[in-house]
Amino acid sequence: MNIGVVPARLASKRLPKKIIADLDGKPMVVDTMEQVLKAQKLDKVILAIDSEETFDALKDYGFDMVMTSKDHCSGTDRVAEVVKKNEDAEVIINVQGDEPLIDVNIIDDLVDLFEDKDVNMGTAISKKLTVDDLLDDNVVKAIIDQDKNVIDFKRNIYDSEIGGLYRHIGIYCFRWNALFQFSMLDRSPR
């Protein structure tokens, strides 16, 4: 089974409550969920929330919501909590809640990557990285090596060696076991 999980943490640091911020008359995460639900290759889509306020703002939209701990260090940890209860999941797609313009084709393409049994995890990047993007700390930059492996993610690249630099798209994908291995890794000090 292929599962999409949208982690939606209310207490975001840079823009608190952004997931329920009004975007054309509805909470931003609603647009994200509507996009993810259009993916052809997902069997199930779950919204992973962490507050009653989020639940109250979204309950009338009919999404499959799971209340998660407020104590997670990352959205991926929130996804792991949800997926732990779905052991029949083979491929897990983690789309960040603040991606209302996510291209559903990217989701389906990432699911297709897992036809190769050697693939355990991945993400999406774009070559479209402008000078403004480079200077914007709100844009996550993915630094990749010559084999197209991501070696780091950065918001601020001022202290970085410029090499294979791409714009990161807020989506990750994992096999079930890889998700839990990843969520058990020590956190970066950054």
How would you describe each model-predicted region?
Residues 7, 94-96, 124-125:
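Short beta-strand segments
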Residues 46, 52-95, 101-112:
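Short phosphate-binding loop-to-helix
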Residues 102-188:
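Conserved core of the sugar-phosphate nucleotidyltransferase
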Residues 42, 88-89, 116-120:
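Short, high-confidence coil segments that cap the C-terminus of an alpha-helix
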Residues 29, 98, 175:
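Residue-level signal for inorganic ion chemistry
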Residues 19-23, 66-68, 188:
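Short glycine-enriched, charge-decorated loop/helix-capping segments at active-site entrances
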Residues 1-48:
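N-terminal glycine-rich phosphate-binding loop and ensuing alpha1 helix
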